[in-house]
A protein has these predicted regions:
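N-terminal metal-binding scaffold of metallo-dependent hydrolase/deaminase domains
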Residues: 1-40
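Divalent metal-coordination and catalytic microenvironments
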Residues: 9, 25, 30, 50, ...
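Active-site metal-binding motif and surrounding structural segment of the metallo-beta-lactamase
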Residues: 38-53
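Di-metal (Zn2+ and/or Mg2+/Mn2+) metal-binding site signature of metallo-dependent hydrolases
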Residues: 51-73
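Divalent-metal coordination cores built from histidine and acidic residues
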Residues: 76-159
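Active-site core of metal-dependent hydrolases
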Residues: 156-278
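His/Asp/Glu-enriched, well-ordered alpha-helical/loop segment
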Residues: 253-334
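C-terminal cap of metal-dependent C-N hydrolases
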Residues: 326-379
Length: 399
């Protein structure tokens, strides 16, 4: 459709001054044309009474390259789950990026950006950084420079099972390469070595630690619950700390302790892939719901899946309800519920409010589309403890 008017919603886009006040949004030719009070309807009309209206959600950590073992179709992880833009976190490297781009990215309804793996083969085989010969810096730079409209960062995994005996060496090279290219480096952290502090120390402004609140030994918190000194120094120079829930990388206890210590996340992401999109992660809205249950304010959580990731990766036209921005919008209810959700350690949290996406509005070119999500009572069907334990045991081999 060419025009769409969303009426009577609670506009929530804190980055540009909308904090839940009632208002309307007009979309025309794939862009937001007007935001504010009572707007004269044009084209199709959505009555958003009782719902929040936000910029389209952005998930900065997914795996949507189907050629790798963890990969799954981007639209399954994106618009079908209420997220209009996703970033693939290192599934492809310089050797296979063009296959990912031509075979998947170009055909997706969901907006897809890539963080190129510093390892040339990406995540085709795992253990991708246990040999420096697996890194081709020149090919990496050439690939990024040829596709800067899609490749918005680099990715490296800093786990013992990935780097082997090389420790910090491949991560330091990834950071050096990203800094020379002028793009962020996202680093997966998990079981050490290398030590988390050593990883943070090679990062600079704009780089991102994902899986920050994993709960494994050697994590972001000291025994007394305070953040480690390297994390404090890193944040001071602009290193960002992301959630990256995943199948083994988010613990309610760790996050709550960090929140109490004043060390909140900078961004919220899922690490969605084939092993967790049916639980315990499900989707970005569910991950947001979990953080809210742990104490994150709604407005802050929405900012961390809209304007913040857009700023981190320079995603022009995304992340705000403002004239001229791309017409990607979420309409969600903030339902009162009484359910229990699991983290990646089988621990649970009582959920009282659910971010329940009702409509995902996405625009490509001059056309705007609406995906309505089933209006059924929310039932997350948490994965059984036995099944989750089996998944975690398998994930430990790679994390």
């Amino acid at each position: 459709m060419d025009s769409l008017t969303i009426k009577n919603g609670m506009l929530l886009s804190p980055a540009n001054g909308f904090d839940g006040e009632k208002g309307d949004v007009l979309l025309r030719d794939g862009k937001i044309a007007e935001v504010g009070g009572c707007i004269e309807p044009q084209g199709e009309v959505i009555d958003a009474t009782g719902c929040y209206v936000t910029p389209g959600f952005i998930d900065i950590h997914t795996h949507c390259y189907p050629a790798v073992p963890l990969g799954i179709d981007p639209d399954v992880l994106g618009i079908q789950r209420g997220t209009t833009t996703i970033l693939d976190a290192g599934s492809a490297g310089a050797d296979n990026f063009m296959d990912f781009y031509e075979g998947t990215i170009k055909h997706a309804k969901t907006k897809v950006f890539s963080m190129l793996n510093i390892a040339a083969e990406g995540l085709i085989r795992g253990h991708e950084l246990n040999d420096m010969a697996k890194i081709d810096v020149d090919a990496c730079k050439a690939c990024v420079n040829a596709h800067r409209d899609v490749i918005v960062g680099l990715k490296a995994r800093a786990s013992a099972s990935v780097v082997g005996d090389l420790g910090i060496k491949p991560i330091a090279l990834a950071a050096e390469t990203a800094h020379e290219l002028g793009v962020p480096l996202m680093v997966h952290v998990g079981n050490y070595p290398p030590a988390l502090g050593d990883v943070i120390d090679v990062l600079d402004h704009g780089d991102i630690i994902t899986h920050t609140f994993h709960g494994k030994p050697g994590g972001v918190l000291n025994a007394d619950g305070t953040p480690i000194e390297q994390a404090v120094r890193g944040r001071a120079r602009g290193v960002r700390f992301d959630v990256g829930h995943g199948v083994e990388s988010f613990a309610f206890e760790t996050y709550k302790r960090a929140l109490a210590a004043g060390f909140d996340c900078d961004s919220i992401s899922t690490d969605l892939h084939v092993e967790n999109y049916q639980g315990p992660v499900f989707d970005l809205a569910t991950t947001v719901t979990k953080l809210i249950a742990c104490g994150e304010p709604l407005a802050d959580a929405i900012t961390k899946v809209t304007s913040v990731p857009a700023l981190f990766f320079g995603l022009d036209g995304l992340g705000q309800l403002a004239p001229g921005m791309t017409g990607d919008i979420n309409v969600f209810r903030y339902d009162d519920v009484d359910v229990t959700l699991q983290d990646a350690t089988c621990a649970t949290v009582e959920v009282r409010h659910h971010v329940n996406v009702r409509k995902t509005i996405w625009s490509r070119g001059s056309q705007t589309h609406i995906l309505e999500h089933p209006d059924t009572p929310w039932d997350p069907k948490a994965v059984s403890a036995e099944e989750l334990a089996a998944r975690i045991a398998e994930a430990k081999k790679e994390n």
